[in-house]
Regions:
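C-terminal alpha-helical "lid/dimerization" subdomain adjacent to the S-adenosyl-L-methionine
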Residues: 37-59, 79-82
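Short, conserved clusters of charged catalytic residues that mark active-site
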Residues: 2, 61, 108-111
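Short alpha-helix
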Residues: 55-78
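A C-terminal cap/extension of S-adenosyl-L-methionine-dependent methyltransferases
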Residues: 81-129
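A short glycine-rich, Lys/Arg-flanked "PGG" loop and its adjoining helix->strand segment in the class I
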Residues: 2-16
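A structural preference for short, hydrophobic beta-strand core positions in alpha/beta folds
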Residues: 19, 77-80
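Short, glycine/charged-enriched secondary-structure capping and boundary segments
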Residues: 2-3, 32-35, 92-93
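Conserved class I S-adenosyl-L-methionine
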Residues: 16-44
């Protein structure tokens, strides 16, 4: 919250702030589908925060909360990131360049479709002042 306020304060008029953030619904999908961790999936549904080995503590917030913290900002774009990529459990495919290209095309195609964005693992927000 404080970081968003500070960035909004120094952002120039017509400047763009780019924020990539965890998406709770995507994390629930990850816990339930990929990790078979129903306890963590239910805890997330109950509003609890989470942890990740690469990120440490994950404190979830809604995309709209950013505007509450810094009302001078406007959300201009929201993209879903990693909607399908991690759902492919055959790790050998992840190294195949043809598979990567096809998956990236699919990911880019659904990145701004609301129904897919809702379950993406991450959201990328572009905010303007």
């Amino acid at each position: 919250m404080f970081l968003v306020k500070a960035l909004a304060r120094v952002l120039k008029k017509d400047g763009i702030l780019s924020i990539a953030k965890h998406n709770r619904a995507g994390r629930v999908m990850q816990m339930a589908v990929l990790l078979d961790d129903f306890e963590k999936a239910n805890a997330l549904l109950d509003g609890e925060n989470s942890t990740a080995s690469k990120f440490g503590a994950i404190r979830y917030y809604e995309d709209e909360d950013i505007i509450k913290w810094a009302p001078e900002l406007t959300v201009s774009e929201v993209f879903g990131i990693r909607t399908f990529w991690d759902l492919q459990q055959n790790q050998e495919k992840h190294g195949d360049e043809d598979w990567q290209d096809k998956m990236m095309q699919l990911e880019m195609r659904v990145a701004q479709m609301p129904e897919y964005r809702k379950v993406a693992f991450f959201h990328h927000l572009l905010l303007t002042k």
